[in-house]
Amino acid sequence: GFYNFFFFGELALDGTIKDTSHIFAIVLSLAKKGELKKVVTSLESAKKLGNIPNIDVYIVNTLNNAIEFIKSKEKDNYLYEKEEIKYEVLNLKDEQYFYNKKYDEDFKDVIGQDMAKYAALICAAGNHNFLMEGSPGCGKSMIAKRLQYILTPMNLGEILEKAKLQALDFKDVDFSPIRAFRNPHHSSTKSSIFGGGSSNAKMGEVALSNNGVLFFDELPHFPSNILEALREPLEDNKILISRVNSKILYETKFIFVSAMNPCPCGNKLSSMKECRCSDFEVQRYKNRLSEPF
């Protein structure tokens, strides 16, 4: 029957059917629940939807095409031919994991800091949170930015989930098996980090870093209310964003990586420069991080 076809697209004034940022997220969520099997949409949308397993995608690029599709008895003529994700594959326990051998940034660029690199390796292997303390310019940020490239390969479900978050964030969907890396500035607002909005609930950096890395540089400079609010997504691996028109629960299974100077001037651990801070100033600086955090 015809009742099991779902149509998605934005209709332009000239009759063409266009992609929108929310189509991929909607179809992926419905497909996971088993609530749809056949999708009719534009070619632009089909290129993304074709990566979702267990659904058939049909292409109609104009309103006239859609009418012809409805009338046609040969609907397979409109079927989109799916392409496999073109990355290296690791088969492990009857499941495929994808990884990319091409890195934008590599640990070989970090000179020295063998102990910090070893700690990063342990962090990546066990999904542990990671705090680096050191003088300015010693390589803390370099190590953090390279961490995403040594994390475990991604399965198809994780790749699709990352693509969904990219789409909802109005970014290009790339389906690359490189885990997310989010790096908010310490001057960022609470709503931009945790999500919010005036009426509709929007994602923040915490939700966008799911299955990846959330990096806070200059950790003590973040407001205490943001650091304390971070404890919930760290402990529960989820965050609820409530607004007037919606309530949305997002997964927050990220590795929290942070970096800080050892004192306000930054020179306490330096062998080249002298620290100008008193013991009281150093203690007050470190007291910005609570014991539970």
Labelled PLM ranges:
Residues 1-131, 135-138:
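Peripheral, non-AAA+ core regions of ATP-driven protein-machinery
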Residues 43, 217-219, 244-245, 258-263, ...:
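A short beta-strand-to-loop transition that corresponds to the Sensor-1 phosphate-sensing loop
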Residues 121, 180, 191-214, 247:
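Conserved alpha-helical scaffold flanking the Walker A/P-loop in AAA+ ATPase domains
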Residues 125, 130-171, 236:
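Walker A/P-loop
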Residues 150-192, 247-248:
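AAA+/P-loop NTPase substrate/partner-engagement loops
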Residues 182, 205-211, 242-261, 289-293:
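AAA+/SF3 P-loop NTPase mechanochemical coupling elements
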Residues 185-189, 201-235, 266-270, 290-293:
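Conserved AAA+/SF3 P-loop NTPase catalytic/coupling segment centered on the Walker-B
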Residues 198-201, 228-250, 269-289:
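Substrate-gripping "pore-loop 1 plus following alpha2 helix"
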